Amino acid sequence: MDNYEFSELLKTLKNKVGNIASIIKPENIQTRLKEIEELENSPSFWSDVKQAGVIGKEKTKITNLLKNYENAFNALNDASELFDLANSENDTETLEALFNDAPKLEDTITSLEISMLLSGENDGKNAIVSIHPGAGGTESNDWASILYRMYLRFCEREGFKVETLDFQEGEEAGLKDVSFLVKGENAYGYLKAENGIHRLVRTSPFDSAGRRHTSFSSVMVSPELDDDIEIEIEEKDIRIDYYRASGAGGQHVNKTESAVRITHFPTGIVVQCQNDRSQHKNKATAFKMLKSRLYELELMKQQDSANTGEKSEIGWGHQIRSYVLFPYQQVKDNRSGEAFSQVDNILDGDIKKMIEGVLISLKAE
């Protein structure tokens, strides 16, 4: 990097921070934080626990947003002032240090962008994720299990907690179906970018001739709904099936019909849950999953309407990403256009940067 490139980078980053400031309005956030502080000092504030919880979440979210903005603004100002000073004194050592720190400065601004992009109504919620293999039997089942492991590793890296809601093993390998709840700050905000069809190209370990195979799996992500969001489901629109749980569970397995499957006729959505020994609890969880999926479907419809009839790029039916393991190694996201060669790292859950690239590119559109 040289002086010209660094000065151009500073211009670009200042422009970004200026645009973000015009959207988030830091002065309005400060005013709102003062209002919340006054509310919290009122004796009656804590009598409504539910409302206090809602305001508490808002406070955490906007405090983090303001903190990220101030960090980015200060880091950029400091770098700009130091650059001018080092230039005027021809201080090559300081200039070299600034050039070396440029990626870190860009990361600080990206952090601000992401925190702005994850300030939507549902982004802070937990996420319900379901993975379904496409046609192709064992090969697709194996691909679904690779994706499942990728998300589990991602959750580990981010400190998210995972609770399995439903797991059905494949007959020879992999899995037929899995649903799990991801708990953590902005779990849905990040994972919503994974909604869609994931394509794998590789030489199949299940093909003795070693031919190249293409497999597909769909990933569906919806926000876990708070109890105060009401979704009406009519009895005539659903069918509830009870069946015996499969998979791990010791002697309890296959003895009682504790697993629950709900089919929603108008949309064709099917959800199932077998993570608890209690049929009653599994039924309650399955209804929660169905409500979340219906809510997500409604969000997509609204997004499509807002896009003047164009299809949203975050959707269950879109092919969003290709993972090519043969004849070359590359993961390419269809929405951001970014390609990555560190395939092993990505399949080991190192997907945060890739997801952030998607969120930024979708916002830019």
From Swiss-Prot:
Methylated by PrmC. Methylation increases the termination efficiency of RF2. PANTHER family: CLASS I PEPTIDE CHAIN RELEASE FACTOR, PEPTIDE CHAIN RELEASE FACTOR 2. Keywords: Cytoplasm, Methylation, Protein biosynthesis. Its main location: cytoplasm. Peptide chain release factor 2 directs the termination of translation in response to the peptide chain termination codons UGA and UAA. It comes from the Bacteria. Belongs to the prokaryotic/mitochondrial release factor family. It is found in: Cytoplasm. NCBIfam families: prfB (TIGR00020). This is Peptide chain release factor 2. It comes from Campylobacter jejuni (strain RM1221). The keyword Glycosyltransferase does not apply. Coiled coil: none annotated. The keyword DNA repair does not apply.
